[in-house]
Amino acid sequence: MMIAVTKRTIPVIPLRGLVVFPYMMLHFDVGRQISLKALEEAMNSDQQVLLLAQKDPKQEEPSPEDLYQYGTVAKIKQMLKLPSETSRILVEGLSRAKVIGYVSVDPYFLVEVEEYKEKGGNLDDPELEALIRNVVSAFEEYARLTSRIPPDAILSVTTIQNPGQLADVIAANVIVKLEDKQLLLEQVDLKERLTKLYELILREKEIIEIERKITIKVKKQIDKMQKEYYLREQLKAIQSELGEKDSLFSEAQEYREQVQKLGLSNENLQKVYKEIDRLEKLPPNSPEIGVIRTYLEWIIDLPWNVKSEEKIDINVVKNVLDEDHYGLTKVKERILEYIAVRKLKNNLKGPILCLVGPPGVGKTSIAKSIARALNRNYVRISLGGLRDEAEIRGHRKTYVGAMPGRIIYALRQAKTKNPLILLDEIDKMSQDFRGDPASALLEVLDSEQNYAFRDHYVEIPFDLSEVMFIATANTLETIPRPLLDRLEVIEITGYTEEEKVEIAKRYLFPKQIEQNGLKKSQIRYDEAVIRDIISFYTRESGVRNLEREIARLCRRVAKEILEENKKMVRITTRNLEKYLGVRKYRRDELIEEDRIGIVTGLAWTPFGGETLSVEALVMPGSGKLELTGQLGDVMKESAKAAVSIIRARAKELGIDENFYKEYDIHIHVPEGAIPKDGPSAGVTMATAMVSALSKKPVRHDVAMTGEITLSGRVLPIGGVKEKILAAKRVGIKNVILPYENKKDVDELEDYVKKDMNFVFVKAIDEVFKIAIKE
């Protein structure tokens, strides 16, 4: 076989799941832009393209690395433009080609190739003649075994004289796998190609023979089943004549007796009886028997009328809740209110609560305690990442592998119709093409509808009105409004330092001492150690990391006791770093003296309150306002509003009225790596600017927070408790707050307000008078 090798450049059309051989004539659709551009280029020149198969058919935008190196040079015989911005082309394979380099990849692939054109073959070569005979013989045997080969293809093989064409035509009709086709396309040497083709045909022939054996075996089994069905029907008739009962009949009777005890309404009872009747009439080998059995078992296992006896002793419930959790007053109060009303009114529906707060504050664990206090069975449903509506409502019975939703599953697990069901992480559900689980929960959490909750699988209404639902969330922002409307929201703020100390003393240390195999006598610590762990090793709203650090401390103590044969280890603030390593955080520090342009603000973070030092600097310039410290858009707008307020009051404040033309103001909030935003720093930035412009110092023992308007009003802010605690932590006792936040301060615990002086202001002028020294 003579092969002429020529080099040329040619545009490429990438193919998905298709390998084209020389001498093949076929049509396919071209829709990708990269292919349409290559097609356009080819039609403008010699109407020839290189067809390269993709290694991964799923790749939408292939790169050169995603294409095979060998392909087929093809001539475009016809092109038809379709309405959907695609073109249907008819191509004829001409010759093999190997890509030796990419000339360009945009807007289409243009490659340099070595093209291999075959020119006849030496048919006098005995080895070649033998290979051709073997391939043709194997092909004819394969064609007799299968109906896949079209008759015209079989006929054309007998008339082909060119050995290369013969190999390619047979390969195109016999080989199924894309990788095998590509392997043959890459065989430039004719003898090697025929040898490999012969191996692949034999393998395909073997697969066909195995398929035939499987078909015959399955047919025999079907015949056997039909015979068995006929005999069983005869046996049924004989048993009926003799008055005997078969196994399905007795099984159906057993199901009827069990269903009768469930206390279902007559309408629902008839629905279940229909399924039992179907089971009775089915042939013993029917696949539907398993489906009906599973359904009936679900119906029987559900607690239709089973209740746990609820505790309605308000003092007992209060003691249990206090025993398990410190603080969480709002949640406990709401449960005690429910108990009080429940005692006065027997048919009270279960409340639907939503506990919202940062991680680690005890939302999930308080739910478990509530269940224990009320003597209700407890079941937790994790909703985080849920995106399929069927997870809530269940799948319809018609689907293969259908199962009930999580609500019904939880009820079967609880074994009572009045459990406490915790819907954990309700804010982390999402939706996709399978539906919106949040919408499915609307019926579940609506006390006016959930007395007849209908699961798609069970199809019988179930009364959820006696279930106590408690949902947990970290934020309300991602909960859809209609769903949020059905929830009674109880916000759980982060714990104060005092609360964390009490929790550590009462619960965390005793628990970790026990879990790490220690005795109380083997470890000594005082309150100062707990405060140091809270301040320097954890920075969170909850106590999850605090418990981790205490656990680490106990493990180190256990290790030291065993290694050094000690009877007792004393932990102090001095040796704490030995057990927990270097401090992870530093304590907020108080500004020690009155300074010009430096003001202490108060900020809220997910980890609690923080003091925020705001610095202002004035320098000659052109009125530019520079803001640094990674401030968000809201803070930047507050700074601009502050400048306008000061301009309007410049004369009263004793400031040069042209300061906005002659001076540049630079405001910086330290710890620039941390993003900061929110409107509550408005009064702080305004005070810092006035101090810097008037050259008057700001009192270092005053902290402030509040949003400002252009008219100078001070608006209320959130996170009051956390901000006051932050001021208290650094030793600041004077706090300026918006007047409308007075009610929030009144609700705070006494220990938070102790030794603190609160000044409530309505206007920014009051802030300037209090904070700036004359």
From Swiss-Prot:
Q: What class of enzyme is it?
A: hydrolase
Example of a GO MF term: ATP hydrolysis activity
Q: Does the keyword Protease apply?
A: yes
**EC number assigned by the record:** 3.4.21.53
Gene3D superfamilies attached here?
Answer: 1.10.8.60, 1.20.5.5270, 1.20.58.1480, 3.30.230.10, LON domain-like (2.30.130.40), P-loop containing nucleotide triphosphate hydrolases (3.40.50.300)
Q: What is its main location?
A: cytoplasm
TM annotation in the entry: none
Question: Catalysed reaction per UniProt?
Answer: Hydrolysis of proteins in presence of ATP
Assembly? Homohexamer. Organized in a ring with a central cavity.
Name recorded for this polypeptide: Lon protease
